[in-house]
Amino acid sequence: MWNDEIIRKATADERLTVSHMALLFAIITLCRRENGYKSIQTSRKILMAKSHIGSLPTYHKCLKELVSLKYVNYFPSYNPKLGSRIQIRE
């Protein structure tokens, strides 16, 4: 299954911190709840709560680095009622 592969890859990657892992696992958990889709539409508030990240700078840093390390794609939504779309990369 695709999420097992991403988990294996992430746990072997020494560049990722606990915060990166928590955010990535929160994204994977939400994807699993969406019937296994690799893409979710969610808000920063939900991801911060699920990953137990309490700091905005930490959240933004981790998300930016997960994008640059090619773990996820991020498509921001500038509509406060719509969440941003996050897609797990293969």
Model-derived segments and their meaning:
Residues 56-90:
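Winged-helix/helix-turn-helix nucleic-acid-interaction surface
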Residues 44, 55-56:
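The DNA-contacting recognition helix of HTH DNA-binding domains
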Residues 1-50, 68, 81:
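Short recognition helix of helix-turn-helix/winged-helix DNA-binding domains
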